């Protein structure tokens, strides 16, 4: 008895093994984060040592809640509510979960797909169907079976898709931290603005009471004939003008309170923040060296991860030029009669590979690849623009803090001088040496300078918050970015090195 020659089957097995071994190949281009040049030090801060280094998001370095540097218990309590109740943060969390789900979706491409089904049908064949022995007859079909298919990742299409999805998920994780930083900074800014209004409100309330007492005294003097009516008119004008400022403070404070309510996730109609007068203590904030900015800013990390995702899309576009290999198998039971349906003679099965490739598509794949390269170039430009904007924001806040410190010192001297002038002018009026108009003028100047001093103090706190935000705040990302941060970095060349 002659046995069938085994060579054809062996050839098929060897060919299949060779194609499967190509799964180690990948069309993904080698990736390294874009390089950016940074100065050795900020223009508004002491110089740092020049040199080269590689910067990656320092996720493992916890810096805590950055707002605690202000030592304000009310602010700390409000900031703690952001993670729990702020709706913008919740949306960013949902976006992150969606990105993570896409990673799982793409990763499923490594695994086979298995389906199962059962079907029963009864049909009648047309009498006029030529060449059919069943013409005019009614037949039944009973079938149950399973099918499996698997597409080996020969050219890395699935790996590239997973890499792109993971990079996008990492970007979403950094986006979440950027949203938190933005919301907490906005909350701190609004809070200090509100506290500044509380201080100014108390100043205006005290001033209104003092002006009212002075007006009462002037009216008594007018009745006694000691002064003329112009002094009373001037005092009344000054009192009502100050009351107008006092009312305006109330409206501005209400708007800030409503904004804070929204940031902490509470209805503005039910939220109230009791007034409290406090002296602002501007903290010392070390800016560090510019290269650290690339390690701290979550928006920079997000931009870099989007560059990586665009790089992975190039790999996916390249993989489309290669054929797809699909291994499929199916088995089941099928019978035209119900009784023998679930018996061994009803068994059927099939097994085999399929290799399919596109020969002509009118240039669609080439266009997709060009688009992927263009998207990569755009993401690189976006990353570098994010870095430039980050340095601009830091320099802006450093300059503002430096200028405001000088302004505060000058304004304090002006406030002290105005207070002294008011005391001297009041004494001269009481001695009959000047008119009450001189007193009104001195009072207005003194009040204006005190309010300006309070406003400068609030602006210094706002600039401090802005600097902390520009420096990345207390960003501490989780394990999502830590994994890639350990294996990739941004090469930085410091100018002048």
For each of these PLM feature ranges, what is it?
Residues 222-226, 429-433, 470-474:
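A short glycine-centered flexible hinge/capping loop motif at secondary-structure junctions
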Residues 117-123, 149, 197, 238, ...:
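Outer-membrane beta-barrel pore domains and translocons
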Residues 127-133, 234, 274, 322, ...:
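Outer-membrane beta-barrel translocator domains and adjoining extracellular loop/strand segments
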Residues 142-148, 190, 289, 349-355:
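Hydrophobic, lipid-facing positions within transmembrane beta-strands of outer-membrane proteins
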Residues 158, 167, 173-289, 400, ...:
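Periplasmic alpha-helical coiled-coil/stalk elements that build and connect Gram-negative outer-membrane
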Residues 2-84, 142, 166, 250-295, ...:
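Terminal intrinsically disordered/low-complexity segments used for targeting and assembly
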Residues 26-187, 325-329, 362-369:
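Short flexible linkers and secondary-structure junctions
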């Amino acid at each position: 008895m002659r046995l069938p020659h085994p060579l054809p089957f062996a050839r098929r097995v060897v060919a299949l093994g060779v194609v499967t071994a190509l799964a180690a190949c990948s069309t993904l281009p080698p990736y390294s984060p874009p390089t950016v040049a940074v100065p050795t030090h900020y223009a508004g801060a002491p110089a740092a040592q020049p040199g080269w280094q590689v910067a990656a998001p320092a996720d493992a370095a916890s810096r805590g809640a950055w707002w605690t540097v202000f030592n304000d218990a009310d602010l700390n309590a409000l900031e703690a509510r952001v993670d729990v109740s702020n709706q913008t943060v919740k949306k960013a969390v949902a976006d992150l979960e969606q990105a993570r789900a896409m990673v799982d979706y793409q990763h499923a491409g490594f695994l086979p797909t298995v389906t199962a089904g059962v079907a029963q049908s009864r049909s009648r064949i047309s009498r006029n169907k030529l060449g059919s022995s069943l013409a005019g007859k009614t037949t039944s079909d009973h079938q149950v079976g399973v099918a499996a298919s698997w597409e080996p990742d020969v050219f890395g299409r699935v790996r590239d898709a997973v890499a792109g999805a993971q990079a996008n998920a990492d970007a979403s994780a950094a986006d979440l931290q950027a949203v938190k930083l933005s919301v907490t900074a906005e909350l701190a800014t609004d809070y200090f603005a509100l506290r500044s209004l509380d201080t100014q409100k108390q100043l205006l309330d005290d001033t209104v009471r003092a002006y009212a007492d002075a007006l009462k005294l002037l009216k008594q003097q007018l009745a006694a004939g000691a002064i003329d009516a112009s002094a009373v008119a001037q005092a009344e004008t000054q009192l009502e003008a100050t009351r107008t400022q006092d009312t305006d403070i109330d409206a501005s404070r209400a708007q800030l309170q409503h904004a804070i309510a929204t940031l902490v996730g509470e209805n503005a109609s039910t939220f109230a923040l009791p007034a409290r007068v406090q002296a602002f203590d501007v903290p010392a904030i070390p800016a560090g060296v510019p290269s650290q900015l690339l390690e701290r800013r979550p928006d920079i990390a997000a931009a870099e991860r989007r560059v990586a995702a665009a790089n992975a899309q190039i790999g996916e576009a390249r993989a489309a030029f290669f054929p797809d290999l699909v291994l499929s198998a199916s088995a089941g039971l099928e019978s035209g009669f119900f009784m023998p349906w679930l018996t061994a003679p009803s068994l059927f099965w099939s097994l085999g590979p399929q290799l399919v490739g596109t020969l002509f598509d009118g240039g669609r794949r080439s266009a997709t690849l060009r688009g992927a390269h263009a998207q990569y170039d755009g993401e690189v430009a976006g990353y570098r623009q994010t870095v430039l904007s980050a340095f601009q924001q830091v320099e802006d806040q450093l300059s503002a803090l430096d200028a405001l410190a000088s302004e505060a010192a000058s304004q304090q001297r002006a406030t002290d001088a105005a207070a002294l002038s008011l005391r001297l002018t009041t004494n001269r009026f009481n001695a009959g040496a000047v008119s009450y108009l001189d007193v009104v003028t001195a009072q207005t100047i003194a009040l204006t300078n005190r309010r300006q001093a309070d406003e400068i103090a609030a602006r210094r706190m706002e600039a401090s918050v802005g600097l902390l935000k520009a420096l990345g705040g207390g960003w501490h990302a989780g394990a999502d970015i830590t994994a890639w941060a350990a294996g990739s970095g941004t090469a930085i060349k410091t100018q002048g090195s």
